[in-house]
Amino acid sequence: MDKLIKTISVSGAFRAYVLDCTETVRAAQERHHTLSSSTVALGRTLIANQILAANQKGDSKVTVKVIGDSSFGHIISVADTKGHVKGYIQNPGVDIKKTATGEVLVGPFMGQGHFVTITDYGTGNPYTSTTPLITGEIGEDLAYYLTESEQTPSAVGLNVLLDQEDKVKVAGGFMLQVLPEASDEEISRYEKRIQEMPAISSLLASENHIDALLAAIYGKEPYKRLAEEQLSFQCDCSRERFASALMSLPKADLLTMLNEDKGAEIVCQFCGTKYQFDQADLEVLINDKT
């Protein structure tokens, strides 16, 4: 089971989230049939989204849009405070040559663009924030967003490792944030540790990458585990929701589907689930509109 662990230093000056999102990203790959580079780009976005949602309370939802001018197209994901996330990539078929070590490159091919977040607090007035893509690596772009937009200095590491068949082997990451109580001396110690931290791919490849991430973040500094939350890829689409969407169409369009197409098929962008509406279903919808 995927999980996110919330921790805080005993001094109260730093907080860190560490995540195992392997099954979440694996589910996304299976649903969207993504090739290597698209899998990693989408996976990193899902992980980033789960970090942002974990910072919220109540029934809030956070949408992340990675909008670049590359062959990936847009990457969109939505996460809630219950650990659920869904998402898709506009072009699932990007398969860029890997490095000599088998690393899948994303940043150099993301292009120019923006990291957009939309936080819906359930009040009808969502808050939107946009920052430029700094590297296109997603993790560094999230760190820049947190530091610039939320005014919380942050370090973020995210990655998705693939096996020899380009299937998801492990996915996860971390976020470390400086809190107002931090002294200059503490900040210097943590900065040095983050700078000397092994590559995120190496930490994720560890036998127990959650413990490896925590050890890399805190070193010998004492910390407390505050909470452990379960994570999963879960879409909230439904036949009823898409029926309502059809009902919003002009009657003429529904008649065209009925008489010419003999039905309608709707595919959820976020999870790939297909919903069939036959002629009888469309007749009911048309009658309900009159």
From Swiss-Prot:
Under oxidizing conditions two disulfide bonds are formed involving the reactive cysteines. Under reducing conditions zinc is bound to the reactive cysteines and the protein is inactive. It is found in: Cytoplasm. Pfam families: HSP33 (PF01430). The keyword Zinc-finger does not apply. The keyword Cytoplasm applies. Redox regulated molecular chaperone. Protects both thermally unfolding and oxidatively damaged proteins from irreversible aggregation. Plays an important role in the bacterial defense system toward oxidative stress. This is 33 kDa chaperonin. The gene is hslO.
